[in-house]
């Protein structure tokens, strides 16, 4: 972790100078490191980020449907996208983690990085106001907002369901066939049953949702052949 004297370097990377550096320090503190951690700031930042991105998409795509707007927002505020931003900022170098998380590589774990990004957004809001925070966040998201489009925002499960509905076929059925690993690092195996396919297709991932999406993506490929 970077020494505290290098926090100004992080401020330059973020593009924001904190009046109250303690807020940034708080945002970088994981629950494993102290009783006063960043989860409340994360909660606040999550809501503010949603407002900022929702507003930006609403004005950027005046003809987009509610469903398209929701899917684009989900893409932009998902944990993977937030972690991507956090890694660009090298946030892992500045996080305050407990010994256990340090040992297990928490400074490079996507979920921890993503949570810290949301906490920083919350901290910036408390240190300034909504408009300053909006300007900062939109700067972080500039290229992402420029490239995102309503098309191709539907996830594989939605696409598979719509395809089958178009053919007036039964909807797919997803079944969990295996769960392995400890609670914090489980692997899910999902089978997707589609009438059009002779055998179920299988998806394996770190969450049930991801496994279902992988299975649905495979089913789509097979049906379209």
Curated annotation (Swiss-Prot):
Q: What does this protein do?
A: Digests double-stranded RNA. Involved in the processing of primary rRNA transcript to yield the immediate precursors to the large and small rRNAs (23S and 16S). Processes some mRNAs, and tRNAs when they are encoded in the rRNA operon. Processes pre-crRNA and tracrRNA of type II CRISPR loci if present in the organism.
Q: Kindly state which keywords UniProt assigns to this record, in alphabetical order.
A: Cytoplasm, Endonuclease, Hydrolase, Magnesium, Metal-binding, mRNA processing, Nuclease, RNA-binding, rRNA processing, rRNA-binding, tRNA processing
Pfam (any one)? Ribonucleas_3_3
Q: Which NCBIfam families match?
A: RNaseIII
EC number(s) reported in the record: 3.1.26.3
Q: What is this protein called?
A: Ribonuclease 3
Cofactors that this protein relies on = Mg(2+)
HAMAP family on file? RNase_III (MF_00104)
Q: Could you tell me the Gene Ontology terms of the biological process aspect for this record?
A: mRNA processing; regulation of gene expression; rRNA processing; tRNA processing
Q: Which GO molecular function annotation, any one, does this entry have?
A: double-stranded RNA binding
InterPro entries to which the protein is assigned, alphabetical:
dsRBD_dom, RNase_III, RNase_III_dom, RNase_III_sf
Q: Where is the RNase III domain?
A: 7-129
- Could you tell me the superkingdom of the organism this chain comes from? Bacteria
Residue ranges of domain DRBM in the record: 155-225
EC category name:
hydrolase
Compartment(s): Cytoplasm
Question: Mind telling me which SMART domains this protein's record contains?
Answer: DSRM, RIBOc
The UniProt entry, under PANTHER family, shows: RIBONUCLEASE 3, RIBONUCLEASE III
Q: Which family does it belong to?
A: Belongs to the ribonuclease III family.
- Taxonomic lineage: Bacteria, Pseudomonadati, Pseudomonadota, Gammaproteobacteria, Alteromonadales
> What are the positions of the active site?
46, 118
Query: Which reaction(s) does its UniProt entry say it catalyses?
Result: Endonucleolytic cleavage to 5'-phosphomonoester
Quaternary state and interactors: Homodimer.
């Amino acid at each position: 972790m970077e020494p505290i004297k290098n926090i100004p370097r992080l401020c330059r990377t973020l593009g924001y100078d904190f009046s109250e550096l303690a807020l940034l320090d708080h945002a970088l503190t994981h629950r494993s490191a102290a009783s006063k951690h960043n989860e409340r700031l994360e909660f606040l930042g999550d809501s503010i980020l949603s407002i900022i991105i929702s507003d930006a998409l609403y004005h950027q795509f005046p003809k987009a449907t509610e469903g398209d707007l929701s899917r684009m927002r989900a893409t932009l505020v998902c944990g993977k996208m937030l972690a991507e931003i956090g890694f660009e900022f090298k946030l892992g170098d500045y996080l305050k983690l407990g010994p256990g998380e340090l040992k297990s590589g928490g400074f490079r774990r996507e979920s921890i990085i993503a949570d810290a990004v949301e906490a920083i957004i919350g901290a910036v809001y408390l240190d300034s106001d909504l408009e300053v925070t909006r300007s900062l966040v939109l700067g972080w998201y500039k290229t992402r907002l420029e490239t995102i489009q309503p098309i191709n925002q539907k996830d594989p499960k939605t696409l598979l369901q719509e395809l089958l509905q178009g053919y007036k076929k039964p909807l797919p059925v997803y079944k969990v066939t295996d769960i392995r690993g400890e609670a914090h690092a489980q692997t899910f195996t999902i089978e997707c049953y589609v009438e059009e396919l002779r055998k179920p297709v299988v998806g394996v991932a770190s969450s049930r949702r991801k496994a279902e999406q992988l299975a649905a993506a495979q089913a789509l490929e097979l049906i379209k052949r």
